[in-house]
Amino acid sequence: MATLTPRQQQIYDLIRQTIQRTGFPPTRAEIAAEFGFSSPNAAEEHLRALARKGVIELTPGASRGIRLRAAGDTAQHQFSLPSMGLMQLTLPLVGRVAAGSPILAAEHIDRQYQVDPSLFSAQPDFLLKVRGMSMRDAGILDGDLLAVQRASEATNGKIVVARLGDDVTVKRFQRKGRHVELIAENPDFEPIHVDLDRDEFHLEGLAVGLIRPAAP
């Protein structure tokens, strides 16, 4: 790893620990709050310095678009498929989901991935290929593989995989009484409002981490 200043090391450690705890990197605002910076712009300057030193990669326009890079730029890092020596957990990769059938039905499984379970905040049950950019500001991009733990309930603020009628979506969960709001992390997308007494809704699981396949 490149030589970091004490403050850069603290920020790098915060990113790594947040990913290990939650499965996702912190936002600029969260970094600023943690270190008492006057604004997220100050955090951005430190992140750019870390990127110049080659220890992280930044995704423009995404508030959680921070990716750790391994020493030597091997691309075997927090968000990439791990090396053969670390492969311990076999997870099915779910592609497109047909209407009316279980998400883990055999016809939905594109392939099996072997991954290191320590990459995730909790043990996942499957991977879901992300389609679209509605969760861009959470650092979840089109083509990413979202690690999902099966669950039928979620607490407010969690990122979930939900089925709405014939559609499967990844959104942030917010519930009040019999009403659920599924919130995108991209201002171009409106929230989805669900009436549990009227709409066909099923929670498939909770996001517990992310794999970003290395570019070819």
Swiss-Prot record:
Supply the alphabetized keyword list: Autocatalytic cleavage, DNA damage, DNA repair, DNA replication, DNA-binding, Hydrolase, Repressor, SOS response, Transcription, Transcription regulation
* Catalytic site positions: S134, K171
Q: Which Gene Ontology BP terms does the record give?
A: DNA repair; DNA replication; negative regulation of DNA-templated transcription; proteolysis; SOS response
Q: Which reaction does it catalyse?
A: Hydrolysis of Ala-|-Gly bond in repressor LexA
Role description: Represses a number of genes involved in the response to DNA damage (SOS response), including recA and lexA. In the presence of single-stranded DNA, RecA interacts with LexA causing an autocatalytic cleavage which disrupts the DNA-binding part of LexA, leading to derepression of the SOS regulon and eventually DNA repair.
**Organism encoding this protein:** Ralstonia pickettii (strain 12J)
One of the entry's Gene Ontology molecular-function terms is: DNA binding
Class of the enzyme per the UniProt entry, highest EC level: hydrolase
List, alphabetically, the HAMAP family matched: LexA (MF_00015)
Q: Which residues, as ranges, make up the DNA-binding region of this protein?
A: 28-48
Site: Cleavage. Where? A99, G100
E.C. number: 3.4.21.88
Q: What is this protein called?
A: LexA repressor
Keyword Nucleotide-binding present in the record's keywords: the answer is no
Family matches, as Pfam families? LexA_DNA_bind, Peptidase_S24
Looking up CDD domains in the UniProt record yields: S24_LexA-like
Subunit annotation: Homodimer.
Q: Which gene encodes it?
A: lexA
Assigned protein family: Belongs to the peptidase S24 family.
> Would I find Transcription among this entry's keywords?
yes
Taxonomy of the source species: Bacteria, Pseudomonadati, Pseudomonadota, Betaproteobacteria, Burkholderiales
